[in-house]
UniProtKB/Swiss-Prot annotation:
It catalyses: a plastoquinone + NADH + (n+1) H(+)(in) = a plastoquinol + NAD(+) + n H(+)(out); a plastoquinone + NADPH + (n+1) H(+)(in) = a plastoquinol + NADP(+) + n H(+)(out). GO terms for molecular function: 4 iron, 4 sulfur cluster binding; iron ion binding; NADH dehydrogenase (ubiquinone) activity; quinone binding. Residues 169-218 are annotated as: Disordered. Belongs to the complex I 23 kDa subunit family. SUPFAM superfamilies: 4Fe-4S ferredoxins. Its EC number is 7.1.1.-. GO terms for biological process: photosynthesis, light reaction. [4Fe-4S] cluster 2 binds at residues 74, 104, 107, 110. Its cofactor is [4Fe-4S] cluster. This is NAD(P)H-quinone oxidoreductase subunit I. It comes from Prochlorococcus marinus (strain MIT 9313). It is an enzyme of class 7 (translocase).
Amino acid sequence: MFGFLKKVVDYTRDAADAANYLIQGLAVTFDHLRRRPITVQYPYEKLIPSERYRGRIHYEFDKCIACEVCVRVCPINLPVVDWVMNKETKKKELRNYSIDFGVCIFCGNCVEYCPTNCLSMTEEYELAAYDRHSLNYDNVALGRLPTSVTTDPSVQPLRELAYLPKGVMDPHDVPANQPRAGQLPAEALKSLSLQQESVQGDEGESLQDASDQDQPSG
């Protein structure tokens, strides 16, 4: 008798635990059903990199002293420093500097230990290329000023979602009381067409005024 009652109690406890676990799982599922998908519609939407983002390395040729500290602190000895010794000045003369971003792990050691601060990390992360050899940047390519997402009018920049409090920004739109940092392609084309129409209208009015002034008075 007691054995049968114990089995009934154990079965009831197991059923209650199973129902509790099922309810917890369904609660998580229903919670996600109420949320909109957080999908960045690249390339029409782009994330704005967070503070101290380690993107493409910027290099200043005039500041480099060819000390090769960046090569020694690099985990894979990646930077290539081409220099010759000037016998007259007894100093190194830098000829070329290159970094292969197809191999770089963007650890930032070269930037941190550079004695002249000729290296810096930028927020540029769009480095995709059809040929992996084109990822080997020389001193000219490294010296190019970085591009910023916020200065591109054809995209809608979105701030890093982890740094925003809940409810500040809809994943697919911005709040009504906040202006967009950029424009979608359709909006950019519309604004450009309006600007062209206004310019043409101003030119027509100026020509009409000039013709009226040229006509002799009766």
